Amino acid sequence: IPAMFEKGMEYGVSHMFIASWNRKGFDCNYPEYYPDMELGTAMDICRGIDAVNRRGGFATFYINARLFDLESDFFEPVGRKMAIKDETGEILTEQYGPVRFSLNCPSDEQWQKQLIDTAVFSAKAYGLRGIYLDQLGSAEPFACYDRTHSHGNIGEYNQGYVRVLSEIKRQMQANNPDAFLMTENCGDIYGSYTWGNLTWNGADYDEYYNMFKYTFP
């Protein structure tokens, strides 16, 4: 991490945005966010981020905001309960590369707590200033018909993520007033909670992206 940071500083870049730090790498094993042993120990990551901070830089870690690996040991006892269910009670799934995931319900307190705690813990434990929540501002919202969930009706998807963003930001900034959140792409109801947005495919895939860009230049 320090070596990569120093290389970035040669180009005037002081922000390290780190993905694939978790066990098994990118788009795999979510939401189990533990350092991949090939990259070193958890303390190695702490030392690396501390070196970045001491050099006047800052770091952001990637966390996916909605996926649960179906092959995870914890999917059946934990993940299935958190999943969005359709009208027939079936879980919604998506596939990225060879890995298939369930879609977690952001308007249910179970997934809210898991996501909030994971983000806040990562920021505190590793000395991060930022947390990036992938897919949050980009992926399609879905209705959830699971009657065991805490949401009052089937259409609270976006309101659930507003609570998640608000609570993560509040807790992170209580520990570090300069802490921030980022999301993939952007949305008007999420924008006031974020410091930045990764908008790599918004123009091609997100509805009303050009209207958003015009309104919020």
Which stretches of residues belong to each language-model region?
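Aromatic-lined carbohydrate-binding/catalytic grooves of carbohydrate-active enzymes
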Residues: 2-116, 126-130, 136-150
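Glycan-recognition surfaces
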Residues: 70, 74-113, 159-217
